Amino acid sequence: VAGLAASCSSGTTAASTTTGPRSTTTTSATSASGLPPIRHVFIIILENEGYDVTFGSPASDPYLASTLPAEGALLTNYYAIGHFSNDNYVALISGQAPNPLNQSDCIHFVNFPPTATVAANGQISDSGCIFPTSVTTLPNQLTQAHLTWKGYMQDMGNIPSRESPVCGHAPIGQPDQTEKAVPGDGYAARHDPFVYFHSIIDDTAYCDAHVVPLGTTTGAMPAGTPAGTTGLAADLKAIKTTPNFSFITPNLCYDGHDSPCINQQGSASPLVNIDTFLQTWVPLITSSPAFKKDGLLEVTFDEADTDNGNPADATACCNEIPGPAAAQPGVTGPGGGRVGTVLISPFIKKGTVSTAPYNHFSTLATIEDLFGLPKLGQARTVTSTFDRDIFTNPG
């Protein structure tokens, strides 16, 4: 497969059980008291499945549903923060709440209106897609703290006339040409949160160096990729080349979004395609020097959804607060639904199960705690972060 380029609205209670670029390891940023010394965080984000489908029994994705939880922690009450895709991706790196345009997946690559202002908790007051430079992101924080990051986007640049091989996005004001996969290219800009912030894309060299193709497991990159640009497989070979924060987005086939896949590279089952991607890339990550030293891998889903015409799950948790532009983050409800998440780390006992409530803002807040960074947006107000309930192994 080398070529694979607090309380919830449902009322759940919290409990935990157990069974059985250049990376900087010494920096001015320090983790919050009581947290393990994690210095390399990896996120793989998948598409459109609720907890009962993904982690149900029997599951069509046994690697994700059974194998990976046995290696780390299963968070059974982890929630997305909105519908549809783009607002969840954006939230993970900025703490920004959904607004009507990114709830609709930003089919046009447009700015916020110039009249938009900053409201409580750093939220932008209007509706738009590309956030103004006044909105700080996790990548901006990491750079300021002399820590490193990269977004690895599968298929980006496979067809250079569709999107650039690095920092791929439409011209401002134009339609997004990546809304649907085409033969040979399943990159979707709406699943690449970094290109929705002027604080990243306005510095072309900065964005080009940090938002790159995933590449293959052998290190091959799409034709036209700038010389010297490396993908995940190459970066994982040494601690010094592994970013402190890695955000990994599969293409529209292997993230489980499309079924069947237009490129006919996957199964008719989105869950089988998800398992194929994870079986290919997770062992590469968990066997890397950086992960074994001080790593944390999160595998999660953008939102809960169904493919049979039923309304999407729009439940929420963790004191999720609507932003100023959208009263219902989940369009029909207060959130993005229950999706579940798996965490793997040397600092997590194998077989841990947590029923505590978490969401995407919990993820952002935890990463900021680990790296000693201020909280952004709704990471300030979320009621739960990953702590001793999760990090059950002293290492």
Residue spans of the language-model regions?
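N-terminal pro-sequences and low-complexity stem/linker regions of secreted or lumenal proteins
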Residues: 11-12, 20-395
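C-terminal motif of bacterial Sec signal peptides marking the signal peptidase cleavage site
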Residues: 5-7
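Sec-dependent N-terminal signal peptides
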Residues: 1, 15-17
